[in-house]
Amino acid sequence: FWRMEKEGSEAAAEALKELGLDVTVTAQAASGESDVQGQETVMKAMSNGDYDAIMVAPISDSNLTAAIEAAQEKGIPMSYCNDKDANVDLPSVVADHKDTAELAAKWIAEKIGEEGQVAVVQGLPTAEAARLRTDCFVDYMTANYPNIEVVAQQNADWDRTKAKDVATTILKANPDVKAIYANNDTMAMGVLEAVK
């Protein structure tokens, strides 16, 4: 996902260059999708750098609040990408987590014949995206597929290795699970490793 975000930004920059604008895209990230302190460090460094604008995707609801406010005080234009900070209102281009979760629920229901047990591997619990993707998936399943039971929900914090371990635990406790919904592609790869 993040590689695609970076590639899309770079492609947009190239298109703007063709129009005569001088645009450079720099992508920086924390060491992992649950490294909230690392992301704050990166954000502070960027706000102290020579950037004309910053687009940010907070890992949690509030880990970047102070860093975003500091960048705003310096007059750096900012926007959100994918997720928002709960405390600072900025323009945003974000995913529709409800729609994504409902599409996943429909797809899974179709694949398992609209009956059976399913489980959820959730991202970082302090991230709105993880909560929305999980809650909307479960709510949609419950409301629309009475013969499908969500038997387990566990956090894996956006981490592939944790997702593999969580999925292994879920499958041992619930051997009749027909599908596992992961909140992101990184965790889905871990779930896939557990299933193999």
What positions do the PLM features span?
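A residue-level marker of the well-folded mature domains of exported/periplasmic proteins
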Residues: 1-196
